[in-house]
Design a protein with these regions (language model features):
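Aromatic-anchored, charged helix-turn/loop surface patch used as a conserved interaction hotspot
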Residues: 2-4, 8, 73, 81
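A short, structured beta-strand/loop element
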Residues: 4-44
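Long, charge-rich, low-complexity alpha-helical segments
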Residues: 28-81
């Protein structure tokens, strides 16, 4: 099953065991969030680690992460931290 949870974020059982990734990639949202938490800027993450992403995609991931923390629901799929 594939669920789009953001403009750039998907949950797809066929990709990375259903973990949140950026649409059209195998880049895990959690990996990008961890880099930001470690102090890297969005520009550094995109330039040095994931050039297939752009600033809008990373900001979408941050917005999605905030929704997860609040216990947001996506259709029939409950998303929880």
């Amino acid at each position: 099953m594939r669920v789009e949870v953001g403009k750039y974020i998907v949950l797809d059982d066929e990709v990375c065991h259903g973990r949140p990734t950026f649409k059209g990639t195998r880049v895990l949202v959690s990996d990008v969030i961890e880099l930001l938490a470690a102090g890297l800027s969005i520009e550094e993450v995109v330039r040095d680690y994931y050039p297939s992403l752009d600033e809008k995609m990373v900001k979408d991931a941050l917005a999605w992460a905030a929704k997860v923390i609040r216990g947001w629901r996506c259709g029939e799929v409950e998303v929880s931290a």
